[in-house]
């Protein structure tokens, strides 16, 4: 698939037969602070509900970002197909979303563009949710407080729209609430169903926190209560991620692997997995800022990945339109 920053391709490691998604970004001026931030933030994150970053590789024409491939496509598509989810199914995915976001925040990374289109699913029967696309994320360790307005209007918190300095972690909570609402209702909470493209109206409704759960949607009072604690205009009074994780609705049928104790033990085990060093990644990004040889097409780039023998990645599905096929979607 192609987007603003480049193309995404599905590739296969010829040794392990494992599939990966590779985002190709043209060398030169496109390798800017956004790209650098995406890579730096993403490479630090190792969690079952976050698309795993593998490495960056330089080809003569492009910077290639190699990451885990989620074969189940977008959560958005699953909702489109279903219309809306039952409360139990919505909770199943919301628990995973909060688990991933909570981990990001513990690593001092706020995503800032959480939406259904940035949540993918793996291919398992009970699908595992995977957060992707860290192009707008901001790490408080590396960066100052977010000031710019990013994101899709439907998901944006009121404090982000008002362009004041805001806490990205608290704004992420709002976006998680929008995601939960869409899963359960099959519509956006602050859009006028008669005028969904009227962004001015959507923004007015967000700023005045004007939403309701339709009568035809049967959800518990606990769920309604949680939504009412997320959709709070004043960020200081909004429920926090740790509070969500203790909310009765969230705790119901919480899988063992979602508990904090289990996740801490898994993270310790994960420390041993080798990762491309920060220095190595930085050096490749710096080199990628120099313009490359533009004579090669995408097939050539993928061939370069193999011929350079970097992890022996081989091109698998020739020129598949990965975006529309639903195999891999990552808005670039």
Swiss-Prot record:
A single GO molecular function term of this UniProt record:
protein serine/threonine kinase activity
Keywords from UniProt, A to Z, are: ATP-binding, Kinase, Nucleotide-binding, Phosphoprotein, Serine/threonine-protein kinase, Stress response, Transferase
Where ATP is bound, by residue?
A: 1-8, 23
Q: How is it modified after translation?
A: Autophosphorylated.
Q: What is its EC number?
A: 2.7.11.1
Which residue intervals define the domain Protein kinase in the entry?
Answer: 1-250
Listed CDD domains: STKc_SnRK2
InterPro entries recorded: Kinase-like_dom_sf, Prot_kinase_dom, Ser/Thr_kinase_AS
Protein name, as recorded: Abscisic acid-inducible protein kinase
The species this protein was found in: Triticum aestivum
